[in-house]
Amino acid sequence: MRQPRAAAHETIEDVGNEAESALGLYISIPFCRSKCTYCNFASGVYPASQHARYVDRVIEDLRGAAAWAAQAEVDLPRRVDTVFLGGGTPNLLAPELVGRLFSALREEFALDADAEITMECAPGQFAPGTLEAMAAAGVNRVSLGAQSFVDAEAHTSGRLHSRAIVGQDLRELRAAGIDNLNIDLIAGLAGQTRASWEASLDALIDTGSPHASVYMLEVDEDSRLGRELLAGGVRYHAQAVPTDDAIARMYERAIERLERAGLKQYEISNFARLGLESRHNLRYWQRRPYLGVGLDASSALRAQEPMPRPQRNGAHS
């Protein structure tokens, strides 16, 4: 079981001394329609009336980013080549909020014409008109959090969608011109079996998605499921969570199946057809700079002067 994360704070890391001309931008949208049983992310169920206030604060932070960077003595490239809206459930935002957010982003930063702009979305939770607003704003990649194509597993975990809804969303996204897609799966959901995992892998491959993310379930102690596991209880089907060994075998099977289907593993949890790897995700692995804005977001930016390396303690040398 994973230990609770430290309190969120903005961090600045030395990401190398070479000049970087482009920035990645991560924007946290922490709103959900329901909270998954295993989730301990900085997100929650809030009334729609708070969405606009939150977006206003994010826009303030975008407008103040240059001044903050100058005060912190870090380089903040104005050119942006990747944007990622994570959550939470960013597709809960009303169309006008999506438009306002991207208008402000473009006022403060110079987006490349071919920038990769990703939005995380929960199936079946697009506010009316939001999909059209996303396309109009330039969103060209969507990460759809299916987690399972077996309805009983999804519902047990607190998800609100069905396999049919995932299929409907994929059709509507493609009709809107967004065909650079990722689909998330989680290995280790309560009640998951070898057979049901194969069914989810079959369904994922059948979608033709050019990218997939496969995560092994990690249960935070402070999540509802984590507290139930610690108490030895049965709520949220805690007794049906697969063993660590079973989860590892599911993950290994996913690697085998996805690579056979043409989705090559390019980091621990991500698989893609050649040339369709997530550019924003690669930014993290390549230690390239990014600015995080919003609740629980962090940044990694190059110091204007190289940061001194800490002295090694002789007792540990």
Write out the residue ranges for each language-model feature:
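Local cysteine-cluster metal-coordination motifs and their immediate loop/turn environment
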Residues: P30-S43
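N-proximal helix/coil linker or "cap" segments that precede and/or mark the start of modular domains
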Residues: M1-A6
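Short active-site neighborhood of thiol/selenol oxidoreductases, capturing the structured segment around
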Residues: L25-S28
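C-terminal scaffold of the Radical SAM
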Residues: H9-L23, S43-Q71, L76-S317
